[in-house]
Amino acid sequence: MADKAWKAFERRAAAYFGGVRCPVLGDDTKADVNHETLYIECKQRKKHSVITLWDSVRQRARKEEKTPVVCLSEKGRPGFWILVHSDDLTKL
């Protein structure tokens, strides 16, 4: 039987970060990936609105031969979130 797409995605993410996918039951964590220092939650959807934004930024960045990075913040919250494609992470 073929692996569910979300399980395969969790395995890819785990491998990328050097962790192991957690089964639903019997693990010490509720994270999707067991890792020594990171709490990794994986979300696979048909479409994420933030990725639609990232696609638009990527098109403009390519025209300038630059690496696309999206920074997100919420009013009144300190700091910000950084969205970078896994293929581009080593370029930063």
Task: Give the location of each predicted region.
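Catalytic phosphate/metal-binding cores of nucleic-acid and nucleotide-processing enzymes, i.e., regions
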Residues: 1-92
